[in-house]
Amino acid sequence: MLPQKRGRIPSRIAMSCYWKVLAIFSLSLPSALSFQPAQPRVLLVSFDGFRWDYIYKVSTPNFHDAMENGVHVKQVTNVFVTKTYPNHYTMVTGLYAESHGIVANEMHDPILNETFSLNKMDVYNSKFWEEASPIWVTNQREGHKTGAAMWPGTDVKIHGVFPTYFMPYNESVSFEDRVARLIHWFTSEEPINFGLLYWEQPDEMGHILGPENPLMGPIISDIDKKLGYLMSELKKAKLWDVINVIITSDHGMSQSSSERLIELDQYLNRELYKVIDHSPAVAILPKEGKLDEVYEALANAHPNMTVYKKEQIPDRLHYKHNSRIQPILAVADKGWEIVYNRSDSFQFGNHGYDNILPEMHPIFLAVGPAFRKNVTKEVMNATDLYPLLCHLLGINPLPNNGSFNAVKDILAEEFPVALGGDTYATVIGVFLGSFLVMVFTAVFLKHFVLTHANTMQMQHTEAAQPLLQD
């Protein structure tokens, strides 16, 4: 028997056990971390023309349920002009209209010598959209997937990119079918992390009836039911508790009257100019050499119409630094309409007025795990939505006119602005895993040192015994 070898067996066994346990732990750690929640998911919903105060005009239980379980912003200052295409593009770029280039629903680009019109196929001309890059382009370039159900611009190839999945615009497609498609995209084997949903109402009926018409009540109630349907379908798909939903609009609506018409024919010969975009913010292109003549004829023509040369447009409107903004802009006061004459078609509701007017402001609700509950915020700018969306998605925002700091107070807790592909669960999981490895290593080393020390003591004792026996 060799006493000096007695301590080696325990140390070898301990070392063998250590490496086995460490190997098992290392193999199991990725599996444990894989149970983290899925990537952040966001659904952006726009009910076109849903004015901020519609929720108080009739019973809207589903809107109020979202308010109680999320965030409600009372006044959202959208961008001028307060029309559909400029504001929908602002929401997904964070830019003023003069910066993103979609300056109106109807446009003429003097550099391209081309027009853009909602009533023609011109809206699919990529050149009009590429002064900015919408959020779905960034989202996909950072490795994620986007799904869009009729959102303006999502069926246009912008910078060579379509959304991963999209529905070509077709007004006849029902709200329910749009929701079903989005649910499918969110729950597929390769799911989207960002969805966009657009619905044409209550804008269409708001134009026909006017926002103050009692007949708008059933229209608003129907929108509330559609929101309830969306919430129900998200719950059925087990998405409601994990998805962040933002419910908003592009603009509000103002009541018009046939008694409040400004007739251009009373002041100016039509041969001198062309109207590019229509009431209540009228973009006027004078014939060559007629700029001053047209301006002077209109400048003081009517007390309820303000006329600007392009360079005179107030800075607060952020609406003069783009070639698609016409040389003259005529803006009607709230409730007034600018027409050629009384034979023109007339609508009882309209938008496009100064964005300082509360009647032009849209609804804004946000509900989901990222948001505080039952919180009311007084004001925000529509441009702030884009950096908020980028934050929620964990992607890096492009330069924009918004401010994340202006809206971060609606979030449930602070997160880094851009986490890339990593979620907080990943960060926490890696930290805890590393910590456990360190603790395990420390405990083992302590055990190993103590065992080794005991072995040395045993060796020393047995080596000394023959001398004692002598």
PLM features: residue spans?
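Active-site neighborhoods of enzymes that stabilize oxyanions during catalysis
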Residues: 273-376, 380-388, 452-464, 468-470
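His/Asp/Glu-rich, glycine-adjacent segments
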Residues: 17-18, 82, 94-211, 303, ...
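Cleavable N-terminal signal peptides of Sec/SRP-targeted secreted and luminal proteins
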Residues: 17-33
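Metal-dependent active-site segment of extracytoplasmic phospho-/sulfohydrolases and closely related
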Residues: 44, 62, 222-263, 330
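Active-site-proximal N-terminal segment of extracellular/periplasmic enzymes that hydrolyze or transfer
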Residues: 30-72, 468
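A long, amphipathic alpha-helix that forms part
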Residues: 37, 172-187, 193-195, 202-243, ...
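Short, structured active-site-proximal loop/turn typified by the sulfatase FGly-forming signature C/S-X-P-X-R
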Residues: 52-100
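Acidic/histidine-rich catalytic neighborhood
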Residues: 242, 249-289, 421-423
